[in-house]
Amino acid sequence: MNSFSQVPPGFRFHPTDEELVDYYLRKKVASKRIEIDIIKDVDLYKIEPCDLQELCKIGNEEQSEWYFFSHKDKKYPTGTRTNRATKAGFWKATGRDKAIYIRHSLIGMRKTLVFYKGRAPNGQKSDWIMHEYRLETSENGTPQEEGWVVCRVFKKKLAATVRKMGDYHSSPSQHWYDDQLSFMASEIISSSPRQFLPNHHYNRHHHQQTLPCGLNAFNNNNPNLQCKQELELHYNQMVQHQQQNHHLRESMFLQLPQLESPTSNCNSDNNNNTRNISNLQKSSNISHEEQLQQGNQSFSSLYYDQGVEQMTTDWRVLDKFVASQLSNDEEAAAVVSSSSHQNNVKIDTRNTGYHVIDEGINLPENDSERVVEMGEEYSNAHAASTSSSCQIDL
């Protein structure tokens, strides 16, 4: 018999798995005295789980776990299976056994069992759970079907806390419906911030249509759901603000000029950019639509002001211009040389242009004017190519 069944006030009995196996069970198997003999001996297979609350009670405090020693017996004298049946049901093992270690040494195993009402295989599962601890030195060894074990019995905890009936003012079915609606609404609110979709109003309308029948009619009577709807409306405004800022940034980068000339006036460009940025900052208190329009106008004006300069300072255009001038120079030189050879005319290419020197051959008036015009064109082309090449060298 147990010599001590009570603990002093203020003490609670909550041993760990290691303490149950290495101290209490080991001393029980070795028939050694336990200093505070607080765990009772119970024949688990002759008592129902609901009776354990009174039989294994410790002190006057409310308990959620009950501990006891039990001696395992075989189901059949010649068999190897353990008898786990009671008068009202049976205990069924579930899952794998858990190993219990102390300082990297195996000391025991823990088996989890669930109580079923009725007889197998048509038993009804209950909320009673039992952890059965046994001494073991080999994790892969054959478990002993006889001997002492220490058990912890408790009820399975519910997933959600149930309110007391006194806290409600209507029927239990209505309370369940209220909890379900609040849960579904919270799921909608919590999942919506992760979806940055442009057509958010359509998504919100789609959620309302997929909710169970009666939700829209119940919104006016549920203050929690109304508060969540206000939060969702506030979130919609935030999403619209972010989308407008995103479009504004895209327009800013799309409308920038492709290439800036190193010889352009940087001071004027900086002044224009500073003026445009200050205008955008001053219009921060205006509506988002006006900000978007002003931003587009400012950057479009900046782009068009630099359009003329860009056409003349673009390196690719300049390269094509130089190539065309060089090709024109070669053609003009070939024409002049051929004309001078045919007419026996000497061309003086000094400094300013061409001079036709007559060697006694009388040229027609039209031919001489044509030679002079061609010489002037060649001089102008040569001067333009020389200036453009100097700019490139700079």
Curated annotation (Swiss-Prot):
One of its GO terms (biological process) is regulation of DNA-templated transcription. PROSITE patterns: NAC. It is found in: Nucleus. GO terms for molecular function: DNA-binding transcription factor activity; sequence-specific DNA binding. Detected in root vessels of protoxylems, outermost metaxylems, inner metaxylems, shoots and hypocotyls. Expressed in roots, hypocotyls, cotyledons and leaves. Expressed in developing xylems. Specifically expressed in vessels in the secondary xylem of the root-hypocotyl region, and in vessels but not in interfascicular fibers in stems. One of its GO terms (cellular component) is nucleus. Disulfide bonds: none annotated. Residues 107-162 bind DNA. Keywords: Activator, Cell wall biogenesis/degradation, Developmental protein, DNA-binding, Nucleus, Transcription, Transcription regulation. Belongs to the plant vascular related NAC-domain protein family. Interacts with NAC083/VNI2. Transcription activator that binds to the secondary wall NAC binding element (SNBE), 5'-(T/A)NN(C/T)(T/C/G)TNNNNNNNA(A/C)GN(A/C/T)(A/T)-3', in the promoter of target genes. Involved in xylem formation by promoting the expression of secondary wall-associated transcription factors and of genes involved in secondary wall biosynthesis and programmed cell death, genes driven by the secondary wall NAC binding element (SNBE). Triggers thickening of secondary walls. The NAC domain includes a DNA binding domain and a dimerization domain. This is NAC domain-containing protein 26. The gene is NAC026.
